[in-house]
C-alpha cells in the first residue's frame, strides 16, 4: 500500500529582496523534520544546487517537532527577505491548519509558495516478527487484537494516512508518537511498535536489508 506526500518550498512573504540584489548571502532552508527523513533528503538535494544556480550557498536548518509546526513557525517569524525558506510537506502546508485549533502563525498570510519539488510515497511496513505477509494478513491480525496493535507516527501525514487506512479496514490501532521517522524506524526494527507507515527514503533501505517487512 502506498500513499503520497507532496513537498514544496515556501518562504515568509518577501518585501525586501529584489531581482537585482538577490541573493547576496547564504539562503537558509528550514526542514521541519529530522535529519534522515524524506523531507530532509529532498531539501538537501535542492539546496545542493543553490551555489551552482544562484551563486550563493544553501544551508539546511533542521527544526523537527510538533508535526512540522516548529519549523514552519520559525520561517513565518523570520525576516521577510527571501533568505529563509521552508521545505514543507502536506503536513505543514495543509494538514496542520485543519488539525490544530490555533497555529502560532497565519497559514494564508505568512507564507508565499515558491516551488513544488515533488512527491514521495509512504509504505506500510511491519516488524519482521509479525506473522503477516500482506495487508489482508495484517488487517486480520489487528482485528483479533483491537487496540493492541501499535503503530508509529512521526508526522501528520503518517498519522492521517494510517488512520484513514484503519478506518477503511475497520480496525482499531493505537498510535505511538515519535519526534522523527529515523527514531520510529529504529523502534519498529526493535519490535517496540508493530507498524509504521513511512516515506520511501526511511523504509526501503531497511526493507531491502531484511530488517522490516514492507506490505
Give the ranges of each region predicted by the language model:
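Extracytoplasmic "Venus flytrap"
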Residues: 29-44, 66, 151-156
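Alpha-to-beta junction loops
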Residues: 56, 78-87, 145-149, 171, ...
Amino acid at each position: 500500500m502506498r500513499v503520497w506526500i507532496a513537498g514544496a518550498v515556501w518562504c515568509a512573504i518577501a518585501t525586501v529582496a529584489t531581482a537585482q540584489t538577490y541573493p547576496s548571502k547564504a539562503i537558509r532552508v528550514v526542514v521541519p523534520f529530522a535529519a534522515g527523513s524524506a523531507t530532509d533528503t529532498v531539501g538537501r538535494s535542492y539546496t545542493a544546487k543553490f551555489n551552482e544556480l544562484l551563486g550563493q550557498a544553501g544551508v539546511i536548518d533542521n527544526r523537527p517537532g510538533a508535526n512540522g509546526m516548529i519549523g514552519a513557525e520559525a520561517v513565518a517569524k523570520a525576516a521577510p527577505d527571501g533568505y529563509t525558506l521552508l521545505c514543507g510537506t502536506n503536513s505543514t502546508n495543509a494538514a496542520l491548519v485543519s488539525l490544530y485549533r490555533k497555529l502560532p502563525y497565519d497559514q494564508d498570510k505568512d507564507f508565499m509558495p515558491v516551488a513544488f519539488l515533488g512527491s514521495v510515497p509512504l509504505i506500510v511496513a511491519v516488524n519482521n516478527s509479525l506473522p503477516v505477509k500482506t495487508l489482508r494478513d495484517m488487517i486480520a491480525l489487528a482485528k483479533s487484537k483491537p487496540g493492541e496493535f501499535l503503530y508509529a507516527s512521526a508526522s501528520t501525514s503518517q498519522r492521517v494516512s494510517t488512520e484513514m487506512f484503519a478506518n477503511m479496514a475497520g480496525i482499531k490501532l493505537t498510535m505511538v508518537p515519535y519526534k522523527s521517522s529515523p527514531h520510529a524506524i529504529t523502534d519498529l526494527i526493535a519490535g517496540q511498535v508493530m507498524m509504521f507507515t513511512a516515506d520511501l527514503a526511511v523504509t526501503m533501505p531497511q526493507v531491502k536489508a531484511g530488517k522490516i517487512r514492507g506490505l
